């Protein structure tokens, strides 16, 4: 697979819970695509997950993907926690239902369609892809707020 796509994702929430947005910057062979959306009542973690899901869902065929996020929650979930959640039927070690299991399952489904390399970047330090995803996530929040 020579189709390597860069995806930068971010989520934003004004109040937690509160109105939230997600943003995605996709870069493929120098061409950029922006995606964003939002929800009236959500959390920052749900928006971080939505950004990753929507970015991967936008790919029409199997791709090599480098997905960059500033979310430790997404990184730890995908790289550390999910394997055991799945073994336990989407329960935590304490036998509690996994929070946001609906979105973790959707992310798992999308990840399985592609070859994804996950990268973490510290947020708000000027990383161009992350900053752009942050702007898009905030656009999602603004659009949800404008609909009230």
From Swiss-Prot:
InterPro entries found in the cross-reference section: RNase_H (IPR050092), RNaseH-like_sf (IPR012337), RNaseH_domain (IPR002156), RNaseH_sf (IPR036397), RNaseHI (IPR022892)
Localization, UniProt: Cytoplasm
Annotated spans, Disordered: 129-148
Keywords: Cytoplasm, Endonuclease, Hydrolase, Magnesium, Metal-binding, Nuclease
Residues at which Mg(2+) 2 binds: 10, 134
Ranges for domain RNase H type-1: 1-142
Catalytic activity: Endonucleolytic cleavage to 5'-phosphomonoester
Single GO molecular function: RNA-DNA hybrid ribonuclease activity
GO CC annotations, alphabetized: cytoplasm
Chain's role: Endonuclease that specifically degrades the RNA of RNA-DNA hybrids.
Oligomeric form and interacting partners: Monomer.
Protein name, entry field: Ribonuclease H
Lineage, broadest ranks: Bacteria, Pseudomonadati, Pseudomonadota, Gammaproteobacteria, Pseudomonadales
């Amino acid at each position: 697979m020579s189709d390597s796509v860069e995806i930068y994702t971010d989520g934003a929430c004004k109040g937690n819970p509160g109105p939230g947005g997600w943003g995605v910057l996709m870069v493929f062979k120098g061409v950029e695509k922006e995606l964003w959306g939002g929800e009236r009542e959500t959390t920052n973690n749900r928006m971080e997950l939505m950004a990753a899901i929507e970015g991967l869902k936008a790919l029409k065929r199997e791709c090599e993907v480098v997905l960059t996020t500033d979310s430790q929650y997404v990184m730890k979930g995908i790289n550390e926690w999910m394997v055991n959640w799945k073994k336990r039927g989407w329960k935590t070690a304490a036998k509690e239902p996994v929070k946001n299991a609906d979105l973790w399952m959707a992310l798992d489904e999308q990840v399985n369609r592609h070859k994804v390399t996950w990268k973490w970047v510290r947020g708000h330090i000027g990383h161009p892809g992350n900053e752009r995803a942050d702007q898009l996530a905030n656009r999602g929040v603004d659009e949800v707020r404008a609909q009230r």
